[in-house]
C-alpha cells in the first residue's frame, strides 16, 4: 500500500484529503479544500489562497487516477462543490473532473444538520450529472481484488449530540498494511471511532484531532488518542482541527511521550510529505503583519463549514 497526504492544516489549508493506492484500487479520501472565511477577524491571506489553488490542482491530478472517491460528510473542506468558490479554489465545473465516472462512497443524509442535508442534495444531483456511481457507504464493505474497504457506522463529528451531526470513517486493508481514516471525529471525543479502529487492527491511523479553540474536553481527547496509540499502529497521523493551533504539540505532549514508549511514530500530513509544517490559518495574523495585503471581504456564499 502506498499513501500520500494531499491537503490539510499542516499544509496550509482546511482539508483532510488523502490518497491511498493498493495493487487493486486507488482511493481519494475526501477530495475537498477550503479556507476559514474569518479567523482572528481576518479573511484568508493571499498566501492561503495560493495554497488552496495548489491543493486543488493536486486533487484534480490524483482524481484522474482514482477509482474511488469518498465524501465522509458535507462540510466544505471534505468535498468538491458544483458551484464556484474562491475559498474552495473551484470554478464550479471541477467537480466533474473529481467525481465523473468514479465510484463515490458518501455519507447518507441521515444524522445531518440542515445545511449538510442541503449540500447533500446539491452534490447528489451533481454526481448524477457527472456520471458518478454514488453509493451510500454507512457501515458498508467492498472488495476490490485483494483489497478490502470498510466504512464505519456514522460517528459523531465531535462530542455526542453535536449539532454538526455525524461522519464516516474508513478502513483499507490490502493484506499487508491496514489503514484507518477517521476524519473530523475531533479527538476522538467518543468511543465509537476507537472501536472501529480496533476492529481494523490498523498499521496506520489518520485521525482528525481535537479543536483546542472550541473548549472541548482536551483531556478526554488525549486519553482517547492514547487508546489509538495502544493499538500499536506503526504510524499515527494527527490532523485537521488540532493543527489550527500553533501550540498544538504542547497541548498533546503526553501523547508524544506515550507514543515514543510504544514505538509509534506520531506524524502530520506535512511530515509524511517531507515538508515543514505551514500552519497558515493559525498564523493568519502574523501573515498579515509580515506580508501586508488588502483585507477583502468574503465572497458571496463563503461561509464557515
Curated annotation (Swiss-Prot):
It comes from the Archaea. SUPFAM superfamilies: Metallo-hydrolase/oxidoreductase. Gene3D superfamilies: Ribonuclease Z/Hydroxyacylglutathione hydrolase-like (3.60.15.10). Disulfide bonds: none annotated. It holds the Pfam family Lactamase_B_3. InterPro entries: RibonucZ/Hydroxyglut_hydro (IPR036866), UPF0173_UPF0282_UlaG_hydrolase (IPR050114), UPF0282_hydrls (IPR014426). Belongs to the UPF0282 family. This is UPF0282 protein Tneu_0934.
Amino acid at each position: 500500500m502506498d499513501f500520500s497526504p494531499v491537503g490539510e492544516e499542516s499544509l496550509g489549508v482546511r482539508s483532510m484529503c488523502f490518497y491511498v493506492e493498493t495493487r487493486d484500487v486507488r482511493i481519494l479520501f475526501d477530495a475537498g479544500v477550503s479556507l476559514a472565511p474569518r479567523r482572528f477577524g481576518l479573511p484568508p491571506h493571499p498566501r492561503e489562497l495560493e495554497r488552496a489553488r495548489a491543493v486543488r490542482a493536486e486533487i484534480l491530478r490524483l482524481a484522474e487516477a482514482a477509482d474511488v472517491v469518498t465524501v465522509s460528510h458535507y462540510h466544505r473542506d471534505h468535498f468538491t462543490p458544483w458551484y464556484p468558490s474562491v475559498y474552495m479554489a473551484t470554478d464550479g465545473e471541477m467537480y466533474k473532473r473529481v467525481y465523473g465516472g468514479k465510484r463515490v462512497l458518501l455519507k447518507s443524509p441521515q444524522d445531518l444538520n440542515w445545511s449538510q442535508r442541503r449540500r447533500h442534495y446539491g452534490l447528489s444531483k451533481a454526481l448524477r450529472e457527472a456520471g458518478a456511481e454514488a453509493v451510500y457507504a454507512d457501515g458498508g464493505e467492498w472488495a476490490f481484488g485483494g483489497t478490502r474497504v470498510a466504512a464505519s457506522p456514522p460517528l459523531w463529528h465531535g462530542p455526542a449530540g453535536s449539532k454538526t451531526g455525524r461522519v464516516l470513517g474508513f478502513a483499507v486493508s490490502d493484506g499487508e498494511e491496514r489503514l484507518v481514516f477517521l476524519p473530523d471525529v475531533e479527538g476522538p471525543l467518543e468511543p465509537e471511532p476507537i472501536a472501529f479502529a480496533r476492529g481494523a487492527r490498523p498499521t496506520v491511523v489518520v485521525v482528525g484531532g481535537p479543536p483546542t479553540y472550541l473548549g472541548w474536553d482536551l483531556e478526554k481527547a488525549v486519553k482517547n488518542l492514547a487508546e489509538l496509540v495502544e493499538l500499536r499502529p506503526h504510524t499515527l497521523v494527527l490532523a485537521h482541527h488540532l493543527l489550527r493551533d500553533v501550540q498544538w504539540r504542547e497541548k498533546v505532549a503526553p501523547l508524544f511521550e506515550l507514543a515514543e514508549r510504544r514505538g509509534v511514530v506520531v506524524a502530520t500530513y506535512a511530515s509524511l510529505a517531507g515538508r515543514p509544517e505551514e500552519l497558515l490559518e493559525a498564523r493568519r495574523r502574523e501573515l498579515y503583519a509580515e506580508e501586508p495585503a488588502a483585507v477583502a471581504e468574503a465572497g458571496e456564499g463563503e461561509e464557515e463549514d
